[in-house]
């Protein structure tokens, strides 16, 4: 009988522990969801506040000079663009969460895909005299969801351009073996401190809070990139040192396994 009691006690204790663990996990999930919503609200409100201030100051002034009017309109346009980027990033992320089960897999030429992305981003890099170089070691064709993978690579290269230094460089390399293909995005940028690297894939996490406004972006890019890569059963790693640039390495199976 004492044996039965002991078993029942052990089972009850195990159930209690399991339940507490589950509660803990739900609490963490709930906290991160609450934080996510408050971050979203903050991100969306910031450009709106700027727009309100700009338009109010135009409305309250008599006979505004044309130059000032144009300058304010330019600023307004920038804020609208910023708001648009935030909304697009959020939609991408929500879509990722929603379509985690639906992968539109097709056979894609990865070389062409990367070249197309770099062609789109080179004009942005050119503004700060940043050279974007693509090194392909072999032709690579893989089974991927083209839209999701494009989003991941675009975000990685965009970040490399954004957090770079004037007259810097971004080096993108593509390689493959018989099982996986590898994409490396290296830059000569500001780098990331060791204690920050664990957090950079979190939604809304920004390494450089002080410059986040002038650099722009939402802090969602890397979360989106990682989501897309994980959906391909791939992995992403980061190597970085402050002031010495950052390298992201991505590996993804050539053949998609659902």
Explain the meaning of each model-derived region.
Residues 78-86:
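Short alpha-helical segment of the dimerization/phosphotransfer core of two-component systems
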Residues 98-108, 112, 143:
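Short flexible loop/turn segments at helix-to-beta-strand junctions
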Residues 110, 191-202:
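Short helix N-cap motif at coil->helix boundaries in the Bergerat
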């Amino acid at each position: 009988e004492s044996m039965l009691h002991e078993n029942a006690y052990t089972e009850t204790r195990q159930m209690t522990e399991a339940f507490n663990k589950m509660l803990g996990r739900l609490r963490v999930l709930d906290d991160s969801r609450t934080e996510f919503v408050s971050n979203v609200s903050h991100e969306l409100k910031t450009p709106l506040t700027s727009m309100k201030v700009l338009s109010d100051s135009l409305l309250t002034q008599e006979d505004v000079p044309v130059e000032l009017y144009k300058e304010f309109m330019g600023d307004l346009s920038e804020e609208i663009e910023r708001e648009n980027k935030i909304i697009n990033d959020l939609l991408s992320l929500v879509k990722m969460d929603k379509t985690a089960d639906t992968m539109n897999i097709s056979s894609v030429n990865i070389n062409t895909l990367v070249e197309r992305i770099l062609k789109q981003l080179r004009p942005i890099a050119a503004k700060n005299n940043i050279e974007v170089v693509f090194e392909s070691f072999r032709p690579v064709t893989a089974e991927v969801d083209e839209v999701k993978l494009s989003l991941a690579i675009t975000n990685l290269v965009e970040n490399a351009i954004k957090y770079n230094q004037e007259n810097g460089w971004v080096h993108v390399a593509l390689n493959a073996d018989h099982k996986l293909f590898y994409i490396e995005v290296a830059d000569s940028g500001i780098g990331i401190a060791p204690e920050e690297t664990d957090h950079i894939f979190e939604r809304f996490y920004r390494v450089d809070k002080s410059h986040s406004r002038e650099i722009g972006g939402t802090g969602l890019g890397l979360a989106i990139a990682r989501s897309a890569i994980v959906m391909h059963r791939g992995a992403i790693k980061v190597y970085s040192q402050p002031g010495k640039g950052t390298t992201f390495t991505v590996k993804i199976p050539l053949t998609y396994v659902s």
